[in-house]
């Protein structure tokens, strides 16, 4: 049974109803409909914390989805799940892939910066200041890109860049 029929959350139900109506009235190919159905089910599973199910749906959504913009959001969401699961290398890979298709995803740059910052903090705890500095520099570059795309957002990152003298 499609996830949209079993979800009990009011907002998810409303989203599913609206999405189903739009799929019926907007001219789309069968591949686009299939991709969207998997994407919608992935979002629903992800919102409930069912990450394995969400990943399965997102991977299925990538097969028929050919639009680079839509595909970027699928890849971004896969990156989010890998981040939540602590699989940072995989997460970075999917954020990169999302940005290859849509370079205007500030949230992907932000999440990549957060991972790099975390790795820098871990390197400090391990006593490796050189590696920590490299990770922090990389985090700074990603945060600068996120901020450039959405000035006024990512205030904490902006402050961190100023405090660490990495903001130009």
Swiss-Prot record:
Keywords: Chloroplast, Membrane, Photosynthesis, Plastid, Repeat, Thylakoid, TPR repeat. It is a peripheral membrane protein. Disulfide bonds: none annotated. GO terms for biological process: photosynthesis. GO terms for cellular component: chloroplast thylakoid membrane. PROSITE patterns: TPR, TPR_REGION. TPR repeats lie at residues 35-68, 72-105, 120-153. It holds the Pfam family TPR_1. InterPro entries: PSI_Ycf3_assembly (IPR022818), TPR-like_helical_dom_sf (IPR011990), TPR_rpt (IPR019734), Ycf3/AcsC/BcsC/TPR_MFPF (IPR051685). It is found in: Plastid, Chloroplast thylakoid membrane. Essential for the assembly of the photosystem I (PSI) complex. May act as a chaperone-like factor to guide the assembly of the PSI subunits. Belongs to the Ycf3 family. This is Photosystem I assembly protein Ycf3.
